[in-house]
Amino acid sequence: MTYKIIGDSCLDLTEELKKDPGFQMIPLTLQVGNVQVIDDETFDQSAFIEMVKACPECPKTACPSPESFKKAYEEADADAVFVITLSNHLSGSYNSAVLAKELYEEEKKEAGEPVTKKIAVIDSLSASSGELDQALYIRDLCEQGLNFETVAEMAEAYSHRMKTYFVLETLDTLRKNGRLSGLQAFFATALNIKPVMGAEEGVIIKLDQARGINKALQRMCDIAVKETGDTPGTVSYTHLRAHETGAYL
């Protein structure tokens, strides 16, 4: 079985994987104030971060259109297409990708053509390195020679089994989107409180908090170890311009 793995641009591919024809990303659109930024190869992370800091409003995202997903399905030179998206609680990417699958199959049937390309859309229930873990898991299953249905079923189960944890170093976004009042954010910042967050079936939840980034990271690791125990698996981490934090982890 030949295969292609497609994700929205929150799929945190390494530079090496970006060159692999077996992977493809469909860009999200980011809105900061009145400025739209396409999350593709032209994306300037440093400039975007400064733009977000300077904007009093919370940044927004727009998911890829069904048409952009459908075009990727049509152009995929593979027997099977596996699509990985951001948690449906964070973005409309999943629904857009599912609609694109339905449109692709309907057009084939209306044209009297057989639907020979199999497509599975999988909600990662996560983001970033969580999507990457899912992509690498699917690749490994395909390389083992498993059939489409088995890979799709195992990938779906993997999403529900995977754990996601993160620490916020700044509370600006929570303040801007109204999840924290200005007063709460002020006192939390003054006391150097960092929230430890996680995802439960794709929904972001607060797990704990600590004073200082290192204590928060340690608490995050403690929670992860407690919840996963001796379960074998892969640990991946992503940071945003926080190399010292990455080294600490």
Tell what function each PLM region has.
Residues K4, A80-F82:
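Structural motif
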Residues K4, C10-Q24, T29, A97-E102, ...:
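Mixed-charge interfacial surface used for oligomerization/domain docking
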Residues S65-E75, L103, M220:
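Short, charged beta->alpha transition segments
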Residues L86-K109, D133-A135:
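Short Gly/Thr/Asp-enriched flexible loops that form oxyanion-binding sites at enzyme active sites
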